[in-house]
From Swiss-Prot:
Sites where a glycan is attached: 22, 65, 96, 277, 336, 379, 428, 471, 537, 573, 641
Topology with respect to the bilayer: Single-pass type I membrane protein
Family matches, as InterPro entries: Fibro_Slime, PA14/GLEYA, PA14_dom, Prespore-cell_inducing_factor
The name this protein goes by in its record: Protein psiM
Side of membrane Extracellular, spans: 27-672
UniProt keyword annotations, A-Z: Glycoprotein, Membrane, Signal, Transmembrane, Transmembrane helix
Similarity annotation: Belongs to the prespore-cell-inducing factor family.
Organism, scientific name: Dictyostelium discoideum
Pfam family, one: PA14
Gene for this chain: psiM
GO cellular component: a single term: membrane
Cellular compartments annotated: Membrane
Keyword Glycoprotein: yes
Residue stretches making up the PA14 domain: 114-260
Length: 733
């Protein structure tokens, strides 16, 4: 067996002593899941080989966007080549691969903050914070163009964010310090408390928690944002904090804390197919969308199965006279103006196409508005007025047997005597009950000279042998809406519809007055209200009617919780109003008589130690209740469910760390007894190590049971992580 060097024995003893002391003070490390957004200067020229300068304040707004948990751009933007692209520093953007499109590559990593017993803080320190070399955009070898001073390639351009929460212990000693180069912002309670924007050299900055408005045991968000934008020096990244109780409340389906799904779902590549009737198809007329963040993804089906697809907006929308049609295979839109039915389509309805109004839609002309039409259509044929209709119209339904009734096209109903008038001026031609007759007129009454006598009138001789002329009674057809005419040479009688009423006005055969006929304005569109109104061209002797069409109001029945609509094909429709939500935590509902309102989304948990909240991004979430201890250095908060009383009953308690951390023990207890016991144990271990080597140490450790449960490895036989020499790494022989 080799001789043991005294120096090595001393180092061994010291190592054991320090290690055992560390056992009593060790705390669990804090793991933080970070979001990384790889940036390429081609797509976002705010990143590149920029010169370092002083810290820039007010690059971001002082309040955090509480829905997306991202900072908003502030007032100091002059140093940014493209301020509009700031929105893509900390959220996924799957844009086109074009200059300054804002395209980024979302990634995720986990960093571990180890407990430092000297300071009582948790620390992560990496002076060469190159976490995503050959990842993100740099998976493509041609993008690996940035190198450090030694010529070694690195991925320099990226942003980091994490959104965690903690519960203050009420001691007022919270601390969070960051040391690094380029941009860093930290928000506490959604307030900007660390403002370090700009491409700059590494410097230490500390959060001022006195401005955070902390309340003991109250859930408090801490949101961290960092960017490495230059290649002038390696990215330095160090976090030091005493917030050992940092935790994440919600993870997306990619497993990222407060993620947006971007690390495992790119809609341009993962959502190209959709489910239709049980078959996955690729429809280029839809916009692929990654699943909602609260979706439970079945890994056997793949994320694409849960993607959503919304229709690409019709580029020709806005006019009721045209629409776009999209080819699902090519995604190419074509314009279709064949919206309205053709004359052939309308013929069975006795209509013909008139025009199309972009706001009102298709309009047609009704062909059964002639004066001899009764206004109904029978399979494409207008129903004509019969003689009975004319009796009703002219004589209120009482037929005069001495006349024939008929409707003359473009003239209307008229009646003519059934008994013809003869040429003998000394006979009076009569009709009674439909029977024609004559009555002789004395010569003295019919043979007098009568200048102006023609075939359209008759005469009566006066005692002084003069005559009086009268128009033939049959000239008047009894219709006040016709102009009655008689040819004085031939005696032919004609009746012409009056021109006093025109347009959509018609003449009332009972009164002779012009009446507006709204039915004559029917455009065949159930979604318009049609009216006949007086035209500006009307005069006292000529009443001109003009048709107007307006969007119909007859569909709206006044119920504020119904949505009324109208279609050319179906007319009026009514559907239940769906009130939109406002974000993930405000639920829309409809209150009768009022309309849409919002109410808080209610999230519940059956157990006290499982908290339920509504998150503005995820909706209802559940997570373990974290309890703030009375003294975070010496105690941990523990949640206890009281199942004996009920599921929702429980409490938070503070329990001392066991074993109690060295700094928390009373001086009197820590002095001689503790040190002595440590020395004794150390001596035992030292002896085991010297005389039995590694196996002796391991056997001793096993015999101690739970006493050494906190030990993670044998410190004597673990190679130093920093390259230094472990004096007893090799077993003595």
């Amino acid at each position: 067996m080799k001789k043991i060097n005294n120096n090595k024995i001393f180092v061994l003893f010291l190592t054991i002593l320090l290690y055992l002391l560390n056992i009593t003070t060790a705390q669990k490390p804090v793991s933080i899941n970070i979001k990384i957004f790889d940036q390429l200067p081609l797509y976002n020229d705010n990143f590149g080989s920029q010169s370092r300068a002083a810290t820039i304040k007010s690059m971001v707004a002082t309040s955090l966007n509480t829905t997306f948990k991202t900072p908003s751009l502030g007032s100091a933007t002059s140093s940014l080549p493209s301020p509009q692209l700031f929105q893509y520093w900390f959220q996924s953007n799957f844009a086109n691969e074009t200059k300054n499109s804002g395209l980024n590559a979302p990634l995720t990593r986990t960093i571990t903050l180890n407990y430092d017993s000297d300071s009582g803080n948790y620390i992560f320190n990496n002076p060469n914070f190159f976490l995503i070399d050959t990842d993100g955009f740099d998976k493509t070898a041609s993008n690996r163009i940035y190198k450090d001073s030694t010529g070694t390639y690195h991925n320099y351009h990226y942003c980091v964010a994490f959104n965690y929460v903690f519960k203050p212990d009420g001691q007022g000693k919270e601390m969070f310090k960051f040391t690094g180069n380029d941009d860093v912002w930290v928000f506490v309670n959604n307030k900007l408390l660390l403002d370090g924007g700009g491409v700059r050299s590494p410097e230490a900055t500390t959060v001022d928690f006195t401005k955070a408005g902390l309340v003991k045991s109250q859930e408090t968000p801490l949101d961290f944002f960092y960017c490495e934008r230059s290649t002038n020096s390696p990215p330095s990244f160090k976090i030091e904090t005493n917030l050992g109780g940092l935790y994440c409340k919600a993870y997306d389906y990619c497993g990222v804390c407060n993620g947006d799904g971007g690390t495992c779902c790119n809609p341009q590549t993962d959502c190209l197919t959709q489910l239709e009737n049980g078959t996955l198809i690729n429809d280029k007329c839809t916009i692929p969308i990654c699943p909602p963040l609260d979706t439970q993804i079945d890994k056997n089906l793949g994320i694409g199965f849960f993607c959503q697809h919304s229709q690409i907006p019709d580029p020709y929308a806005g006019s009721l006279c045209e629409k776009g049609e999209c080819d699902s295979l090519t995604g190419i839109w074509t314009r279709n103006t064949s919206i309205c039915p053709t004359d052939k389509d309308l013929a069975p309805q006795c209509r013909k196409q008139a025009t199309c109004d972009p706001k009102l839609g298709c309009q047609s002309t009704y062909l059964c508005n002639n004066v001899c039409d009764i206004g109904t259509c029978n399979n494409g044929t207008c129903t004509q007025k019969t003689s009975n209709d004319c009796v009703q119209e002219l004589d209120r339904g009482v037929e005069d047997k001495c006349f024939t009734y008929k409707c003359v096209p473009n003239v209307g109903c008229s009646k003519t005597p059934i008994c013809p008038r003869g040429t003998d001026p000394c006979k009076n031609y009569t009709c009674s009950g439909g029977i024609c007759g004559t009555v002789d007129i004395p010569q003295s009454e019919c043979s007098c000279p009568c200048p102006g006598l023609n075939k359209c009138n008759t005469r009566i001789c006066n005692p002084d042998n003069t005559c009086t002329l009268f128009n033939l009674t049959e000239i008047n057809d009894g219709n006040p809406c016709t102009d009655d005419l008689c040819d004085p040479v031939t005696g032919d009688i004609t009746h012409v519809m009056t021109t006093r009423c025109s347009g959509c006005n018609t003449c009332d055969v009972k009164t002779g007055k012009c009446v507006a006929q709204d039915s004559h304005c029917d455009d065949g569109n159930p979604c318009t209200d049609n009216a006949c109104v007086a035209s500006a061209n009307s005069t006292a002797n000529s009443q001109v009617g003009q048709c107007t069409q307006t969007p119909t109001a007859k569909c709206d029945l006044g119920d504020k919780c119904m949505v009324y609509s109208c279609t050319l094909e179906g007319g009026c429709n009514a559907t239940q109003r769906v009130c939109p939500n406002s974000g993930a935590c405000k639920i829309g509902y409809c209150e009768p008589g009022f309309g849409c309102k919002l109410k808080d989304r209610v999230c519940s948990s059956d157990w006290y130690c499982i908290e339920a909240q509504c998150d503005a991004k995820y909706g209802c979430i559940q997570f373990d209740r974290r309890c703030a201890p009375d003294n975070s250095k010496c105690q941990e908060g523990v949640c206890v469910n009281n199942t004996a009383i009920g599921k929702n009953d429980g409490k938070c308690i503070s329990e001392d760390y066991d074993p109690k951390p060295f700094v928390c023990q009373k001086a009197a207890l820590v002095s001689t007894a503790v040190i002595a016991s440590v020395v004794v144990v150390g001596a035992v271990v030292l002896g085991a190590a010297i005389f039995a080597g590694k196996k002796g140490y391991d056997a001793w450790k096993t015999s101690q049971g739970n006493v050494m449960a906190a030990s993670q490895a044998n410190p004597l036989y673990t190679q130093s992580s920093n390259g230094g020499e472990n004096p007893l790494y090799n077993s003595p022989t």
